């Protein structure tokens, strides 16, 4: 039997990132998934990450503010040392993900306040980062094993949208009709892909995160 240094159970974002990072460090890794689809609940999520003090954060953001917020909302359930470590080094995560081909951004800034806005250290926006869409065709046949988004996260239960698009369409804010037409044209105009599947070639939200991580593994 081949020697394995690390066994990772589950192919969600946490599992895939753990496997990739262990491989980066020179360890032999095996990732196990019980389902016939990969991605877990991460694939069905919004795919966003909470990164305090990132390049697009509110000007008053800081590691100290983030730690104060985390200590308040976790109510002692997480050791302070772990919270402090997260507040300090999580800002490195977007760059690491970008090196894997998974790109995050804040758009538009200051529109996603922290869940507990009255808590000490809360930010009015900028800490929640969205994942950029990706072309599902680069996954080859593995595209069809990627766990699908929930129907309510898609237009007509099948057309992918990202978080800024969803906000714009829901609020019918400036330019929403043009955005809707562009999304429809991208989906219905892709005749070659439509002959293969009803699923959108454009991956967004958690599907984009998981698809990008799978591509990074060479899978």
Annotate each predicted stretch with a short phrase:
Residues 1-3:
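A short, basic/flexible loop-to-alpha-helix module at the beginning of a structural domain
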Residues 5-31:
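N-terminal Rossmann-like FAD-binding beta1-loop-alpha1 element of flavoenzymes
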Residues 34-219:
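Conserved N-terminal/central alpha/beta ligand/cofactor-binding core
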């Amino acid at each position: 039997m081949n020697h394995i240094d690390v066994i990772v159970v589950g192919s969600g974002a946490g599992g895939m990132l753990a496997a990739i990072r262990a491989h980066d460090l020179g360890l032999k890794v095996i990732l196990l998934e019980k389902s016939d689809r990969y991605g877990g609940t991460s694939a069905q999520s919004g795919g966003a990450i909470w990164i305090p003090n990132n390049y697009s954060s509110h000007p008053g953001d800081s590691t100290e503010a983030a730690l104060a917020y985390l200590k308040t909302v976790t109510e002692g359930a997480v050791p302070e040392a772990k919270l402090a470590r997260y507040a300090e080094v999580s800002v490195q995560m977007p760059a690491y993900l970008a090196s894997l081909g998974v790109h995050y951004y804040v758009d538009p800034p200051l529109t996603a306040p922290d869940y507990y806005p009255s808590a000490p250290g809360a930010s009015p926006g900028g800490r929640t980062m969205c994942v950029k869409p990706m072309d599902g065709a680069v996954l080859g046949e593995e595209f069809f094993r990627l766990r699908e988004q929930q129907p309510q996260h898609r237009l007509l239960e099948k057309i992918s949208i990202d978080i800024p698009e969803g906000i714009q369409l829901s609020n019918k804010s400036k330019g929403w009709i043009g955005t809707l037409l562009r999304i429809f044209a991208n989906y219905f105009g892709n005749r070659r892909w439509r002959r293969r599947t009803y699923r959108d070639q454009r991956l967004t939200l958690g599907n984009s995160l998981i698809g990008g991580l799978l591509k990074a593994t060479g899978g």
